[in-house]
């Protein structure tokens, strides 16, 4: 019973936080630090409650965020923002290593699909807010990540 309440709380909280991140980043091009902090706290509590591996949470924290940090440094902050790095780091605590990689791949997929459409509809907006796409990838992975990973691994030849 309590475990079910925790799962409901976790899904609702992550959904609200991702909506907040999406709207704030879309409007003002910044990812709220408090949302990242709360997401990290939920990830830590979830890893304790569900008895997930600390190694997986730590790897999830570093794998994608390190790649984004390299991108940030190599473009001198013009290619990606620090808030996007923070968001993917703390989502790694919640999703684990494979889940965070999947969330990032889904976000990149949505950018590739939706960015040309956005360019046609809103040609005056030059900058791209990555937060909404990252949030979508995080939410989809949070909801169906294990199913997506299992479906991928069950393909013949993999």
Model region roles, listed by residue range:
Residues 1-158:
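A membrane-topology feature that recognizes alpha-helical transmembrane segments
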């Amino acid at each position: 019973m309590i475990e079910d309440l925790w799962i409901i709380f976790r899904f609702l909280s992550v959904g609200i936080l991702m909506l907040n991140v999406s709207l704030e980043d879309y409007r003002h091009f910044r990812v709220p630090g408090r949302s990242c902090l709360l997401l990290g706290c939920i990830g830590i509590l979830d890893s304790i409650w569900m008895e997930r591996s600390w190694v997986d949470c730590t790897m999830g924290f570093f794998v994608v965020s390190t790649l984004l940090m390299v991108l940030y440094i190599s473009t001198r902050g013009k290619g990606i923002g620090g808030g996007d790095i923070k968001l993917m780091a703390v989502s790694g605590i919640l999703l684990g290593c494979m889940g965070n990689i999947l969330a990032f791949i889904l976000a990149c997929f949505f950018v590739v699909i939706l960015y040309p459409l956005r360019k046609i509809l809103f040609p005056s907006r030059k900058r791209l807010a990555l937060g909404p796409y990252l949030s979508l990838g995080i939410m989809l992975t949070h909801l169906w990540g294990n199913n997506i990973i299992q479906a991928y691994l069950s393909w013949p030849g993999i």
